[in-house]
Amino acid sequence: MKLAVVSVVVILGVLVAWPVSAGRKDLPGAGGYGGDDDDDTKSLFPLDNLLSLNYYDRICPDFEKIVVTKVREWTKSDSSLGPALLRLIFHDCGVTGCDASVLLDYEGTERRSPASKTLRGFELIDDIKSEMEKSCPGKVSCADILTSASRAATVQLGGPYWPNVYGRRDSKHSYARDVEKVPSGRRDVTALLETFQSYGLNVLDLVVLSGAHTIGKASCGTIQSRLYNYNATSGSDPSIDAKYADYLQRRCRWASETVDLDPVTPAVFDNQYYINLQKHMGVLSTDQELVKDPRTAPLVKTFAEQSPQIFRQQFAVSMAKLVNVGVLTGEDRVGEIRKVCSKSNSRAY
């Protein structure tokens, strides 16, 4: 069964216990923003009971311990892997749902799409899967591993913890043509909202999950059109602060180079991203569009002015929604528990 937004009733008590309500009252508006008339927590808990917080308690009790240990080991030697894992889960969930289709690696898959060429973290997921197969063979899906690893990476970066439910199955198929569903760095807010709403997410989730750009880097190739000869003007995008545009031009002479998405606190999971947007220092055009659009600008302003903890709390809620988009469950014949994350079982040998 494909579920647009799946969860379990048992999580309700956990989420309600989060200190989110204190931050919610500071968010502008209600309808459409996740206020009293649009309670996100209610949409998280349909009565299907197909995923569970304790899914692996008996069949693989060390599941989360293995994930956290491996993420810590890998990010210790390469700190850029933390943001990379967050980006990887976004790209997985944003195509056909959180089904690990992005991990399949053969001709014609999402992973082989030109739009996926800068994705990273695959080797870490493979390492975790290899360890799982030693501890509890055939029990843990790659989709659940990626979901758990993205949270472990977020926490490792100083971000929030959120409760994950498990029991996802892995997709047997992956198609490069589907990658166009992932929001690109050049879409306007209307297009972004249409995409998010198709996932069962709302405008608050859009602004909050965009805040993941408080860490990580952007490929200069994705922003050079904003820096050089913008709209055939021979100059840069006028929506970028002039001094910041000059800085980016000096850092992005070659498409292969990278630049911090947050130039102020690039290694800290905080609300600086929103402060930067208020100062016209958004690296991606989609980031800066959030300040210009009246549907999103009030939220950007709120997260910029409130305590960073408000952003962290809401990020946890929005991530708990995102990682349950379009999952495959135990009743799905189209899903499986892969033996190797990069290959469907029919291709594993």
Curated annotation (Swiss-Prot):
The lineage of its organism: Eukaryota, Viridiplantae, Streptophyta, Embryophyta, Tracheophyta. Ca(2+) 2 binds at T214, D262, T265, D270. This is Peroxidase 7. Residues 1-22 form the signal peptide. Binds 1 heme b (iron(II)-protoporphyrin IX) group per subunit. The gene is PER7. Its EC number is 1.11.1.7. Keywords: Calcium, Disulfide bond, Glycoprotein, Heme, Hydrogen peroxide, Iron, Metal-binding, Oxidoreductase, Peroxidase, Secreted, Signal. It comes from Arabidopsis thaliana. It is an enzyme of class 1 (oxidoreductase).
